[in-house]
Amino acid sequence: MARTVPLERVRNIGIAAHIDAGKTTTTERILFYSGLVHKLGEVHEGTTVTDWMAQERERGITITAAAITTRWTKRDPKNPSQPLAGAPEYTINIIDTPGHVDFTIEVERSMRVLDGVIAVFDSVGGVQPQSETVWRQANRYNVPRIAFVNKMDRMGANFLKVYNQIRERLKANAVPIQLPIGAEDEFRGIVDLVRLQANIYMDEIGKDIRPAPIPEEMKDLVAEYRAKLVEAVAETDEALMEKYFAEEDLSEADLMAGLRKGTISGQIVPMLCGSAFKNKGVQMLLDAVVDYLPSPIDIPAIKGVLPDGSEVSRKASDDEPFSALAFKLMSDKYGDLTFIRVYSGVLTKGTYVLNSTKNKKERISRLVVLKADERLDVDELRAGDLGAVLGLKDTTTGDTLCDENAPVILESLYIPEPVISVAVEPKTKADIDKLSKALQALAKEDPTFRVSVDPETNQTIISGMGELHLEILVDRMLREFNVEANVGNPQVAYRETIRKPVSRVEGKFIRQTGGRGQYGHVVIDLEPAEPGTGFEFVSKIVGGVIPKEYIPPAEQGIREACESGVLAGYPLIDIRVTLVDGSYHEVDSSEMAFKIAGSMALKEAARRANPVLLEPMMKVEVEVPEAFVGDVIGDINARRGQMEGMSTEGGISKVNAKVPLAEMFGYATDIRSKTQGRGIFTMEFSHYEEVPRSIAEAIIAKSKGSGVTN
């Protein structure tokens, strides 16, 4: 089957923002105006297409990244209500991502497979903590983006305030290509700075849009921001710069070409405005998506590693060998769905492919594209497509699927570590097996959700990104798997690390039991690594003092020993282990012996290397009426918090601090009682930091007395 839409007319985009900035409503309006749905869905009524899980509709938040395919034809500038005659149709694959920090992995895995992002900002709140997190994630994968300042109809809406915040707090080159006409109740239209025309909304559902002259009172402001736009575009290209110096202006075509080039290269973030809920600005936003965000062929070719370790690029083309990345797993009543982004080649139903990450073959029995929870069967997925495969056996998030005859492993995802744990136990004996199956299914879907068993208490421990994350997962166990469970109090995911390097520490495992014995001997150096690096292993074995087949088992033993540190049994992180020496026995050496020797060496080295306990520090932003700010700051200090700044605007104070997670349990209730219900806060993981000695001693003593949950 031939490609129906050429690759240059495909857009893979995400819609991402802080919670409550209006991402899901923006997505719903995109689906409405592009004709995919014929009735407007509302988050507060629980009728949206992309929020399809029961918990999402109840809570009014997006939890999972929902993928949807729609079509768009550009509007006619002279009659913005209508498509441009003869204009081609574009395919837009959209992923609506969560804004709550507990669901960061959903945003992370979406960013990995997207070509462009619409970053939605609340016109009142502006740049909020999760906006910064989303921005960092987009930076990590170099994703081009456009900014949509939403909710221009809200009390306190201020487009230019958000413009300044994006430039100052996100350090981004935000360039308005629109200005709002009016704000709050008076918001009635948008000035297009590229075409220098006003567009006025004449009806409530945003379908009757009429061009008009720029209002007299806005002419100076429009001239100022048009000049900024022209200058920013000129700086992206030498030829445009010369033209700008010669003529002091650029044509509409020059501006659009320069904006596209600057957006795709990350030099420019075009800024648009509107009110998705009031149906204003969404069609122009869609035009900007096709005008300025990249197609799969505009972005650098995906890089991968061949079986021999050499690097290779796979271009976005149907003619290249097939390669795809699995970015999300989902189970529902129809079976297991694996969402994939096809980077090169064609995937056809009924064929076999290789999961090169696990070196397993997978059969492609069914392929679907999604309209949220509705599935449309297709025969193939081509380069640049987002879709899902049903019934894969061994594939998990971050795995590469590829042509068996052209194996490659694509760069995977960054997966953050869980910071909070709780014990769960089934309410009845009948629930024991069901609990185990439910936890396995949920852990397979969500790589930030971990399941372990405490070796001392034999309790099942679940770990995740925050209290809401675990609450939703426990709720899903009840709804989807019919499992009732008792849930313990939250526990902090402490970690251990070392403060000084130690060299030439031996691990020797010798056992003679009659017949063949066991012999493994390794010598390691252990040193602290950069915070955030986790675990690094380097082998400097030369001359065959340890045969190469015994080095991976030694590394495995070292890695497994890191799972339970020497102070309190918490995982050991941010260390570098170098295998420097060892010996072996021709007859008695085995993989198991070297695995045990590696584990022994690591434990001994960690004891000597000044081990310390680490705790997760959270980035906390509290918004309270000015009158309560003194109490809030005092409370943060009492929680061992470190103040990082404060600002006050319109009688509302924003307090920024870093606070240990251990001190933040129950804060939602405390902040409400301290501020008469008027305080709100957001919290996200920042980094690990050493626990003060007196507190560390108590944690270590408790872990030795009662077992440890990690």
From Swiss-Prot:
GO terms for molecular function: GTP binding; GTPase activity; translation elongation factor activity. It comes from the Bacteria. NCBIfam families: EF-G (TIGR00484), PRK12740.1-5 (NF009381), small_GTP (TIGR00231). Keywords: Cytoplasm, Elongation factor, GTP-binding, Nucleotide-binding, Protein biosynthesis. GO terms for biological process: ribosome disassembly. This is Elongation factor G. Pfam families: EFG_C, EFG_III, EFG_IV, GTP_EFTU, GTP_EFTU_D2. GO terms for cellular component: cytoplasm. The keyword Nucleotide-binding applies. It is found in: Cytoplasm. Its main location: cytoplasm. PROSITE patterns: G_TR_1, G_TR_2. Transmembrane segments: none annotated. PANTHER family: RIBOSOME-RELEASING FACTOR 2, MITOCHONDRIAL, TRANSLATION ELONGATION FACTOR G-RELATED. Residues 8-297 form the tr-type G domain. SUPFAM superfamilies: EF-G C-terminal domain-like, P-loop containing nucleoside triphosphate hydrolases, Ribosomal protein S5 domain 2-like, Translation proteins. Catalyzes the GTP-dependent ribosomal translocation step during translation elongation. During this step, the ribosome changes from the pre-translocational (PRE) to the post-translocational (POST) state as the newly formed A-site-bound peptidyl-tRNA and P-site-bound deacylated tRNA move to the P and E sites, respectively. Catalyzes the coordinated movement of the two tRNA molecules, the mRNA and conformational changes in the ribosome. HAMAP family: EF_G_EF_2_B (MF_00054_B). It comes from Synechococcus sp. (strain JA-3-3Ab) (Cyanobacteria bacterium Yellowstone A-Prime). Belongs to the TRAFAC class translation factor GTPase superfamily. Classic translation factor GTPase family. EF-G/EF-2 subfamily.
